[in-house]
Amino acid sequence: MAGPIEQFAIKPIVELGEIGGQPVAFTNSALFMVLTVLGAAAFMFLSSRRGTVVPGRWQSSAEILYEFVSKTLRENAGEKGMAFFPLVFSLFLFILFANLIGMFPYAFTVTSHIIVTFALAMLVFLTVTIYGLVRHGFRFFRLFMPAGVPVVLAPIIVPIEIMSYISRPVSHSVRLFAVMLAGHITLKVFAGFVIGLGSLGTLGMLTAVLPLAMTVALTALELLMAVIQAYVFTMLTCMYLNDALHPSH
């Protein structure tokens, strides 16, 4: 049985040549990112192609997700934040589908790679920074001096706030990456226990009951975490967008 880390290996599927002496290939990671986008697009197409007053299952599911993200965005960024709804909803769907697809046997979890989650976090960071500077100009830098803080504390507070702001893409991306990585490793380890004990005969199969129960419980927990982490990433995105809209708050 393969080790618990091997499931995260990026493997080439189609070699595409070289650029600057470096090999270029269509990998399993790229394949599952494409499948994630296609899955999310298919879900939205099926749920919206026949809009009815009394929604069916597909339409109800899409409306629940729409209202959930819409409410989260309004609560954290205000009514003006709805201008960013397409971005926020797309991020939520991508992460949710990527996490759920990764739960299938032999599937690849793209959100277990820091390069993917960091790219998503940088997209949010650059959107917030560029929009904030374009909309507010130098007033955007009020973000680094919270309202009500005495001026005498500025030499201490401002550097701390700047470092906190710059480190956002790291904390934003590591949270999702670490949770998905740790969850899948744990599942793999317990599944390995079940297979290993089961191969020992009758006594081993009886002993494997506890690891099997743990594996089932961890699978349910990992499904829950797949949804929660999509929500957490989305909520933090909404909070950061609020800084671009209201830097003086």
Curated annotation (Swiss-Prot):
Record keyword Cell membrane present: yes
UniProt-annotated location(s): Cell inner membrane
Gene Ontology CC: plasma membrane; proton-transporting ATP synthase complex
Chain ranges passing through the membrane: 26-46, 84-104, 114-134, 143-163, 177-199, 216-236
Superkingdom of origin: Bacteria
Location, primary (coarse class): membrane
Bilayer topology annotation: Multi-pass membrane protein
Key words of the record: ATP synthesis, Cell inner membrane, Cell membrane, CF(0), Hydrogen ion transport, Ion transport, Membrane, Transmembrane, Transmembrane helix, Transport
GO molecular function: proton-transporting ATP synthase activity, rotational mechanism
Matching Pfam families: ATP-synt_A
NCBIfam families: ATP_synt_6_or_A, PRK05815.2-4
Oligomer status and interactors: F-type ATPases have 2 components, CF(1) - the catalytic core - and CF(0) - the membrane proton channel. CF(1) has five subunits: alpha(3), beta(3), gamma(1), delta(1), epsilon(1). CF(0) has three main subunits: a(1), b(2) and c(9-12). The alpha and beta chains form an alternating ring which encloses part of the gamma chain. CF(1) is attached to CF(0) by a central stalk formed by the gamma and epsilon chains, while a peripheral stalk is formed by the delta and b chains.
Family as reported in the entry's similarity comment: Belongs to the ATPase A chain family.
The name this protein goes by in its record: ATP synthase subunit a 2
Protein species of origin: Brucella anthropi (strain ATCC 49188 / DSM 6882 / CCUG 24695 / JCM 21032 / LMG 3331 / NBRC 15819 / NCTC 12168 / Alc 37)
The gene coding this protein: atpB2
